[in-house]
Amino acid sequence: MSQGFRTDIQALRGLAVSLVLFYHAGFDFLGAGFLGVDVFFVISGFLITDMVRKEVEAGRFSFKTFYFRRAKRLLPAAYATFLASAVVAPFALNAQELQDFIKQVWGAVTFSANLVLLMQTGYFSGAADLKPLLHTWSLSIEEQYYLLLPAFLAFTPRRYWVPGGVLMFVASLGMCLGLQSFKPTATFYLLPTRGWELGVGSMIALMPGLMLRLQPVLAALFWPAVAVLAVIPVFPTGLPHPGLDALLVCLATAVVIARRHPLLERALVSRALARVGDVSYSLYLAHWPPFAFLKNASVSTVTPLQSLLTLMVGIGLGLLLYRCVEMPTRRWQPQPSRGFAFGTFVTSCCVIRSEERRVGK
């Protein structure tokens, strides 16, 4: 279960972001393309847990190094997206929408966008389509998970990792299923009711020996898991989300990751999806604001042609973000320092504050 570069995981990323992009573009054949986010959650839980577990076991884990790497990997492209959206927002949003947008930016910068959006709207409501940073809710959940997971692994004795992980997984899933009927919006947006999805990935990373022993079982489950990932986004269960559909997709994703089928390393479709997966983070960041700004500017229903053109614009912006921001900052190799994260945060706060003053005039 080595982390390394894995074509199969990159292909899963490519599938996930494709589902989300086509769903947001309004393609009718993807009634549940939003499940791509659930695939992302499992992948993130697996990769982060696998990395931290190995470093803790080797006695070389450092909180400073971990959070520096996360900041360098995630923040530049995200903050570039927030800044570009802030430039466009005054020309596309009315006064109230602009005030809401500024709150969304504050939430995204402070890893609490899911909480801000919970106070503003439900994800599936019509008003949600008008929010340029709606998609940052999932990034905030992942970042909140990254704040908690390393502490759990670093300070908990190894013999309690799996029992503790199972307990938290069951508690989170139970809260999700139990609260879905009563608090659907909160269930959608909050880490306690979404953490189990990242926990699925974490659990297979915490049990590499068991995953090896279960390879015959995983081999039998592999193609049914692939079928789940192919079918459910097209033919959704119609049940409340997150619920049974998310559980099936998360478990299917976990099976594919744990099985590591050699076919996914060689198949042409996997390699094509892996290329998309390489740029999935920038595509995810850049694709949604154009849709939101289009819907804010439209006086009538957005046409399929407009959606297709907007999707192409979003993809183009995502590729530009990848080439000009994400890749250069990933190659940058400074020494970890508190000043990097603090300086980035302060700069972002100054930009947001400047935008607030401009709105207030």
What function would you assign to each model-found segment?
Residues 1-337, 348:
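Membrane-interface helix/loop caps of multi-pass membrane proteins
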Residues 336-358:
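Internal/C-terminal transmembrane anchor helices
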Residues 248, 356-361:
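Conserved small/polar residues in nucleotide/adenosyl-binding loops
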